[in-house]
UniProtKB/Swiss-Prot annotation:
Annotated region described as Disordered, given as residue ranges: 61-83
Record GO terms (molecular function): sodium channel inhibitor activity; toxin activity
Record's function text: Probable ion channel inhibitor.
Protein name: U11-theraphotoxin-Hhn1b
Primary localisation category: secreted
Signal peptide: 1-21
TM annotation in the entry: none
Superkingdom of source: Eukaryota
Disulfide bonds: 75-90, 82-95, 89-110
Subcellular localization, as worded in the UniProt entry: Secreted
GO cellular component, one term: extracellular region
Length: 116
């Protein structure tokens, strides 16, 4: 019976000592993995930042192309409100106060010139 106790005690001591070593080893492995995870996160963050900067540059480039190609309107069409002091009606149109149905509005509109 003593040999069984000694054998059991010996197995117990070995299990505890090896288990403790495994615990320390596991702790070190976890620290390494978290450090690697942080480096992966930093890498992913930098990659995402680069992609966002490229996208922003493309969007700004498209905006500048649109503004370069778009043409500002120089005249106002028929039936469109205009300013009495600064008429910008297109050729063949005159800025006049509306008659009849347009008297309710306090604005001038571009109308065709009347040939008299």
């Amino acid at each position: 019976m003593n040999t069984v106790r000694v054998a059991f005690l010996l197995v117990f001591v070995l299990a505890v000592s090896l288990g403790q070593a495994d615990k320390d080893e596991n702790r070190m492995e976890m620290q390494e993995k978290t450090e690697q995870g942080k480096s992966y996160l930093d890498f992913a963050e930098n990659l995402l930042l680069q992609k966002l900067e490229e996208l922003e540059a493309k969007l700004l480039e498209e905006d500048s192309e649109e503004s370069r190609n778009s043409r500002q309107k120089r005249c106002i069409g028929e039936g469109v409100p205009c300013d009495e002091n600064d008429p910008r009606c297109c050729s063949g149109l005159v800025c006049l106060k509306p008659t009849l149905h347009g008297i309710w509005y306090k604005s001038y509109y571009c109308y065709k010139k009347r040939s008299a």
